[in-house]
Amino acid sequence: AAEAIADGVITENADNAKLQPELNRTALLWNSWQDHAIGADILCYMNGYKDPRMEKMFLANDVGDYVGIRIGIDVTSKSQAMSKYSNMIVASDTPYLWFNAAEATFLHAEYELRWGSAETAKTLYEQAVRLSFEERGASGADAYLVDATKKPAPYTDPLGNYSASARSEITVPWETATDGSDTEA
């Protein structure tokens, strides 16, 4: 990791690794076949945090909510169920994204947290969030990064069978552990 960082990594969205296909075939999976839905976990975090990127990334369900599907549930009627869950926004001309500046910056932050400086890790974490907001065309990154009150939402299954409590109490702002646990392997 240190060598890659020293040699230079993606730091701007203009350098994101994308491929513009003639036809994005994943659009068939999401839009035509209706075989996929967004995972419940990501939407519980994003709903709880009131994340502005959500509407840039996902389609709301048939009643205007953002709801993911839990892994392994029993769906007896695909046609009934799929309208209840959110879908990815992807069009036939959407480029394939292999790697982006936000992910590179998050990974750099993890490296710094483990082998470098917690303060540098904090700065990189915040920069990664800002890059993600910028890539999605969402506003409000600075307010998002300092909101220490919002937490992941519990999961309410729109079909009523698989609801669950929130998986975490974590908030968005960076907090450095005072006991050194943030740098342990």
What are these model-predicted stretches?
Residues 1-140, 180-183:
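Structured, solvent-exposed acidic/aromatic patches
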Residues 133, 137-140, 145-185:
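C-terminal functional modules
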